[in-house]
């Protein structure tokens, strides 16, 4: 399940990175086609294989820290050079709208079948998160050693949510501003050429488009790599017999899983489109329902076993 979920993530990132490369170097996307996708997959796989070879501190952590700095520099540039007031105001409106309609949107099943959004996206993302759940839990526990459960939960939910809100608010609102003001036909480009072309088109409307696109390509490449170097690390740890809590899996084992994760996306990208990727995630997530239930029961038993016994007062004892 984890191999399928991670491979799908790489498969989703490859078309976007490939489109950025063709725009940067003036290549013909149609002429290069699948060959360019293979090159991108190889570069991404080689990057996170190198990262996982150096381990948590020297590889994964260092690469992640660099990329966070680059990503926030890119976001700050968009806010500064774009419609700053529009981005900020619409961002606050969007957060308020989500909070007001969270329950309704979370339980919307589209019983009247007015669109295919629920089947195409809501179920797809739920299945993807379910498939990634065991790996994320194992990896977060590994890097959170020494922290309390409260710190770990608040850190994952708080920082993860905040990062998503900031990215959607800045990049999404800037694209919406271009569409509403007739500066760039975002929707038309998405429908005719696909989301990667629309994203590249939006970025090229900024000042110094080549520099912005180069930075965005690097950020996408490293984000893809840092997402899956942790996957290969976790897979190697799970496949190692009797690995002590403070020990690390063998380097060759980590690199083996890294390159194995890079093989499946080749097939998915070759099939083309989002449908094969969505179908793959939905399929691999089904067996993990039972795994999630067992993990939940195991966590409950562990917490009960580790919880300190209640202290009875002298008055209560009498």
Where are these regions (language model features)?
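Helix-loop-helix module between adjacent transmembrane segments
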Residues: 1-15, 23-52, 81-84, 218-228, ...
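Helix-loop-helix connectors at the membrane interface of multi-pass transporters/channels
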Residues: 13-37, 71-77, 137-147, 151-162, ...
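Membrane-interface interhelical connector segments
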Residues: 100-115, 174-210
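Loop-to-transmembrane helix boundary motifs in multi-pass membrane proteins
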Residues: 31-49, 53, 122-131, 152-194, ...
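Membrane-water interface regions at transmembrane-helix termini and the short interhelical loops
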Residues: 19-26, 44-66, 82, 136-149, ...
């Amino acid at each position: 399940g984890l191999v399928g979920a991670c491979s799908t993530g790489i498969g989703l990132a490859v078309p976007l990175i490939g489109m950025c490369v063709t725009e940067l170097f003036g290549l013909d996307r149609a002429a290069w086609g699948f060959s360019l996708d293979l090159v991108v997959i190889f570069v991404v796989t080689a990057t996170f294989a190198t990262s996982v070879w150096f381990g948590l501190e020297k590889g994964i952590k260092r690469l992640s820290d660099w990329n966070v700095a680059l990503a926030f520099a890119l976001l700050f540039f968009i806010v500064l050079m774009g419609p700053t007031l529009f981005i900020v105001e619409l961002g606050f409106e969007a957060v308020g709208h989500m909070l007001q309609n969270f329950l309704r949107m979370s339980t919307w099943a589209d019983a009247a079948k007015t669109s295919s959004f629920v089947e195409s996206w809501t179920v797809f993302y739920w299945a993807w998160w379910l498939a990634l759940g065991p790996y994320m839990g194992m990896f977060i526990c590994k890097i959170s050693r020494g922290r309390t459960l409260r710190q770990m939960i608040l850190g994952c939910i708080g920082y993860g949510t905040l990062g998503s809100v900031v990215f959607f608010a800045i990049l999404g609102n800037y694209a919406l501003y271009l569409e509403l003001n007739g500066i760039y036909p975002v929707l038309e480009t998405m429908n005719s050429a696909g989301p990667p072309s629309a994203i590249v088109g939006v970025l090229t409307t900024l000042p110094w488009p080549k520099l912005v696109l180069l930075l965005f390509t690097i950020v996408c490449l490293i984000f893809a790599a840092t997402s899956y170097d942790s996957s290969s690390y976790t897979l190697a740890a799970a496949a190692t017999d009797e690995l002590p809590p403070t020990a690390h899996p063998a380097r060759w084992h980590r690199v083996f899983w890294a390159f194995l994760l890079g093989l499946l996306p080749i097939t998915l990208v070759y099939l083309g489109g989002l449908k094969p990727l969505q179908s793959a995630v939905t399929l691999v997530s089904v067996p993990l329902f039972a795994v999630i239930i067992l993990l939940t029961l195991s966590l409950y038993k562990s917490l009960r076993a580790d919880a300190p016994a209640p202290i009875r007062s002298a008055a209560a004892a009498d």
